Design a protein with these regions (language model features):
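Positively charged n-region of N-terminal signal peptides that target proteins for export
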Residues: 1-5
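...with weaker cross-activation on analogous glycine-rich loops/strands in unrelated enzymes
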Residues: 110-244
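N-terminal capping segments
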Residues: 18-144, 299-311
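Low-complexity, Gly/Ser/Thr/Pro-rich intrinsically disordered linker/tail segments
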Residues: 233-311
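Bacterial N-terminal signal peptides
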Residues: 7-14
């Protein structure tokens, strides 16, 4: 998958270790994106089926290989198929860290804790944080001290989801002009909370899932930000789906108008060396905020901002 004409030069910067700034990290992310195949299938199921001989988590484990004698893993993007959105951003993060870490700043213990495990539910361990509802990757980066997050919210459309009496749903023009869009850099990670108000749902105002019948539940997308189209639409890479034929979906570039997003979290990694702190994040370590978003409750905007360090 070729995204930029400078992809080979970007990869050379990462692999050579000629890194001087956070911008170079973002270039490693873009080079990592470029190493992934196109499509490969979109699948969120927990068991193989007639369309997919393995699940996404099984595919991730095949792609992430580290034996007992290895100080760091290898990650083979071609094996990480099928996929879904948060598996794609997790996989790109791992690949980018491997491209960036030419000086072995990240310990074997940290790498081992980054291994994706099917036993890690949302909010548990490294993978369980990256895969969680809400701002999972943003919380993970904040916990590790590896970067910063910014967030913006258009407001709830319905009274039932408003957090205060003075909360207002911004017009398309106001939302498109929000300063958050100017602060995102290609190679940043984004969590997009979809605006589904035209269909009668206010799910874009909701953070997490509470499994209460009749309540709106979060509908979001974990992506790598690539920039903007000439008309201002958001351009991103992820595993995009579902659709009519999930076998022909998966890794791809997508775009959407800003009006299709109701809430956004932008995660900007500035200290990739701090991913070594994952050595203190074993598979059974729990982030209760994230684990609660997996069927127990919704979060408020204020709670989310605290958890991602963006108060």
């Amino acid at each position: 998958m070729r995204i930029f004409a400078t992809a080979i030069a970007i990869a050379a910067i990462c692999i050579s270790g000629l890194r001087t700034s956070a911008t170079d990290w973002n270039e490693c992310v873009l080079a990592a994106v470029d190493s992934f195949p196109e499509r490969g299938g979109y699948y969120t199921g927990g068991r193989p089926n007639a369309d997919f001989s393995k699940t996404t988590i099984q595919a991730l484990n095949e792609a992430f290989q580290m034996d007992s004698a290895d100080n760091r893993p290898s990650f083979t993007p071609a094996l990480a198929q099928p996929s879904f959105c948060s598996s794609a951003t997790y996989a790109v993060l791992i690949k980018a860290l491997l491209m960036w870490d030419t000086d072995n700043a990240i310990s074997r213990e940290a790498w081992e804790n980054m291994r994706p495990l099917a036993t890690e539910d949302d909010g548990f361990g490294f993978w369980g944080r990256a895969n969680a509802n809400g701002p999972g990757l943003g919380v993970l980066v904040h916990e590790l001290g590896a970067g910063n997050n910014i967030a913006a919210f258009r407001g709830a459309y319905s009274e039932r989801n408003r957090e205060s009496d003075n909360e207002r749903y911004l017009s398309d023009e106001e939302w498109a002009a929000d300063s958050v869009w100017d602060k995102a850099t290609p190679g940043d990670f984004m969590k997009l909370f979809w605006n589904r108000n035209p269909s009668g749902s206010d799910s874009g105002a909701v953070i997490g899932c509470n499994n209460v019948a009749g309540d709106d539940q979060e509908r979001g997308h974990s992506v790598v930000f690539l920039g903007y189209e000439p008309n201002g639409d958001i351009r991103y890479w992820s595993s995009n789906g579902p659709g009519k034929d999930n076998r022909n979906l998966g890794y791809s570039i997508g775009s959407c108008p800003r009006s299709h997003v109701q809430r956004v979290v932008v995660t900007h990694i500035t200290r990739p060396d701090r991913f070594d702190n994952a050595r203190q994040m074993p598979p059974d370590s729990e982030n209760r905020f994230l684990s609660d978003l997996n069927g127990r409750r919704h979060a408020t905007t204020a709670e989310m901002l605290r958890q991602i360090g963006a108060e």
